[in-house]
């Protein structure tokens, strides 16, 4: 007796018929398609064994149903894009959804690298420095009057040049006599200490810290021999080409302050009228 060879589902004999194995169990074509065939997203009918089953993200189509939702062109073996569960050819997707390049006004195709800034988009090769025309890419840039500049070009064209080192001032800076300086370049002419944020004065247009200015140029007190800066409201007495701090202008003998008083001189000394009686 011949061994039976039947469909695992309907038990119909498979001798002389097409069959399909599923987990090593034979099925007739009709049962296999009923039980296991995927349903086409487009037409809603099973995708039979004699048809190509095209799939995308767990969705399936007959080969003839796999087309653009807008223009109907076939997407078989062509690039496509998905938008809200619909499949679109690249032309239809670009026309409806792709951004336009701010520079060349052409569509930025899906999958193409693009640059975005403040709501505008560029092809990567179109996002260039206004001055040198080189692509900016992921490098730093500076916008100026609706134009974009790479940092070196911006500094050459717009940044102030330090009067001392002649290099661009990109941050901060100091203005002295209407000329720009880097903070680190604006230093005392004598000791080279930075003057930014410090009190300073000038001699022949050269800046000096107060200490160096006093040491170099200030008059010396005839009493204590220390410099009289004359800065910041410092008061002093001047008499016959000699100067004294107010606190140092005292009688040589009794140390009485002579500020606002009459006095006498004895050689290099100054005396109050009472001490001067003995001269």
UniProtKB/Swiss-Prot annotation:
There is a cross-link at residues 78, 167, 220 (Glycyl lysine isopeptide (Lys-Gly) (interchain with G-Cter in SUMO2)). PROSITE patterns: LIM_DOMAIN_1, LIM_DOMAIN_2. The modification Phosphoserine is found at residue 238. One of its GO terms (biological process) is heart trabecula formation. SUPFAM superfamilies: Glucocorticoid receptor-like (DNA-binding domain). Highly expressed in heart but also detectable in brain and skeletal muscle. Residues 40-92, 101-153, 162-212, 221-275 form the LIM zinc-binding domain. A zinc finger (C4-type) spans 7-31. Pfam families: LIM, LIM_FHL2-3_N. Induction: Up-regulated in hearts exposed to isoproterenol (at protein level). PANTHER family: FOUR AND A HALF LIM DOMAINS PROTEIN, FOUR AND A HALF LIM DOMAINS PROTEIN 2. The third LIM zinc-binding mediates interaction with E4F1. This is Four and a half LIM domains protein 2.
